[in-house]
């Protein structure tokens, strides 16, 4: 989990540099919206750690069926948690950015970018819980490989799309 966190921070830094190639305002908008996303990233990982404890207890107690049930429940809970965080980001992005004191020139870029990132919150919630389930089943390499591949594809797509689409190209 620590390696995933460091990788996520590194991708965030590279992504900020990509946004800065567009303009200073784009970099500021990216950083502000990404700050909200990063806060939820940590929240999803904390919940995922709790899921990992329960799954590990079930597996340690020889109750594979209970571990499977917890994993399915975690997927359902992650869906709801992702949706409940994505909806405010989608529907109230300008208000959230104003609450974070977004400057007037940054707000028109930051709010739509946060709205474009909103669906990714559901995916990140799933990623957090399912990576934890994989790790508790001693599939740490596979879990890390998925995260590395995901970040590589995302950065590759951002490199191609950001010059023509701006911050929206990163969100895709």
Q: Which stretches of residues belong to each language-model region?
A:
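Recurrent gating helices in multi-pass secondary carriers
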Residues: 5-13, 86-90, 151
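Broad structural signal for hydrophobic residues in well-ordered alpha-helices, predominantly aliphatic
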Residues: 18-19, 96, 134, 161
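Short alpha-helical scaffold segments that flank and stabilize functional sites
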Residues: 13, 18, 22, 36, ...
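Interfacial helix-capping/hinge residues at the ends of transmembrane alpha-helices
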Residues: 16, 52-53, 94, 128-131, ...
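Transmembrane helix-bundle signature of multi-pass secondary active exporters and lipid flippases
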Residues: 1-53, 57, 117-124
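Short runs within selected transmembrane alpha-helices of multi-pass transporters and secretion channels
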Residues: 48, 116-135, 143-154, 171-172
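Small-residue-rich hydrophobic transmembrane alpha-helices
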Residues: 29-87, 127-143
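Short alpha-helical transmembrane segments in multi-pass integral membrane proteins
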Residues: 1, 55-122, 153-172
């Amino acid at each position: 989990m620590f390696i995933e966190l460091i990788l996520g921070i590194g991708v965030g830094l590279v992504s900020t540099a990509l946004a800065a190639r567009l303009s200073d305002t784009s970099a500021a908008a990216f950083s502000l919206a990404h700050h909200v996303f990063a806060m939820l990233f940590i929240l999803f990982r904390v919940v995922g750690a709790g899921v990992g404890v329960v799954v590990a207890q079930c597996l340690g107690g020889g109750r594979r069926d209970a571990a499977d049930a917890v994993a399915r429940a975690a997927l359902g809970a992650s869906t709801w948690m992702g949706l409940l965080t994505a909806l405010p980001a989608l529907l109230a992005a300008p208000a959230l950015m104003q609450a974070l004191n977004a400057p007037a020139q940054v707000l028109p870029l930051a709010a739509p970018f946060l709205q474009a990132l909103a669906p990714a919150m559901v995916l990140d919630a799933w990623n957090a819980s399912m990576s934890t389930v994989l790790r508790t089943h001693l599939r740490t390499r596979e879990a890390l490989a998925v995260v590395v591949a995901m970040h590589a594809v995302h950065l590759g797509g951002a490199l191609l799309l950001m010059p023509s689409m701006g911050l929206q190209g990163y969100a895709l």
